[in-house]
């Protein structure tokens, strides 16, 4: 393994371990909806969430899908998730988030956000910067965005992220799926998938807590 690839794997492993540790309590408290998660099957016929007919990258090797039931009004859940500039106020894994345009979030909107990557014995701590562009959005129903991520020693060519929101008995079922592509992300698919999955589980947990808290205010 080259030195560059070794450093990358170390970086991704550190991110995976950090996120997994932060979300370790999830499995003990997961509802049936929350339990339906894991690396998504690569089959084109295994239908995941879509927004206006578009889903994640069907050819991506790194992918993860999950869902959570949120006991809050649909509008509150959708608003919490799509008010991207407020992410740092309720997402433990988001340091900063800024819109690169103005007005309501819509197809064509872009935003830049950052998440920490912890230090390892061989690499210093860094910050992963993600620039996302919304391609599809349907109010109170779904949103899909894509974009690259860059940090010291780590790069994801493109992440594709889809969210759907459906009213069901007991609240709103939030489903999400994300894929990563690029040589670096694919250098160690299991570890990259672990990092992606741990991050999405924490995101869902934080979204549930934030939306339910705001609904009771």
Set out the residue ranges of the language-model regions:
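Secretory targeting and sorting signals
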Residues: 1-35
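Beta-strand/loop substructures that line and gate deep hydrophobic ligand-binding cavities in soluble
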Residues: 146-198, 202, 207
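Short, surface-exposed coil-to-beta transition loops
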Residues: 63-65, 125-132, 156-162
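Solvent-exposed, acidic/flexible segments
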Residues: 70, 74, 80, 127-128, ...
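Hydrophobic ligand-binding cavity/cleft-lining segments
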Residues: 2-5, 30-101
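A generic structural signal for beta-strand entry/edge sites
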Residues: 61, 108, 140-142, 169-173
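Glycine-rich portal/gate segments that line the openings of hydrophobic small-molecule binding cavities
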Residues: 99-153, 205, 210-217
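Hydrophobic pocket/interface hotspot
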Residues: 76-81, 87, 111, 134, ...
